[in-house]
């Protein structure tokens, strides 16, 4: 339970401060634990980042499926509506996972955590659409919204929603 609380605090700290800026001492303060406790659960700054990303991953998947309608077009539309809400509330600067990879491009553990997260999101969208053959195109729309959000905002979501509808209706 304490590990999860620390991971939740790390997620908030990295989301607000980025990955390069906060020192381990600042992260310790943000988590309201001793340095020993922090290192017991996350023995390096990279492990802290991975812990925060894994915590956020599960929170994100749960968030996408919250009050989800029946699978199919309605469910995918719901996912994109939830994506917009997530970006507005929790990720105004875009995808935290991609920001972590950009900050640590050569770190194998961070790269692996991000890759697993993205693959699970791709599979979820395919499953919810009832069109697993369209998992990758739908995922690319999802990622496009995340990337374009800081510049286009709601326009990115609206455009993706139009493409989702066309893609799912035209390929039936």
Q: How should these model regions be labeled?
A:
Residues 5, 9-47:
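Helix-turn-helix
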Residues 87-111:
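Amphipathic alpha-helical segments used for helix-helix packing
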Residues 45, 76, 80, 94-98, ...:
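A general structural signal for well-ordered alpha-helical segments in protein cores
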Residues 51, 65-90:
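Hydrophobic alpha-helical connector segments
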Residues 83, 97, 101, 138, ...:
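Short alpha-helical scaffolding segments that buttress acidic/His motifs in well-ordered protein cores
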Residues 47-56:
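Alpha-helical DNA-contacting segments of helix-turn-helix folds
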Residues 110-115, 119, 128-172:
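Hydrophobic/aromatic-rich alpha-helical bundle segments in the mid-to-C-terminal region
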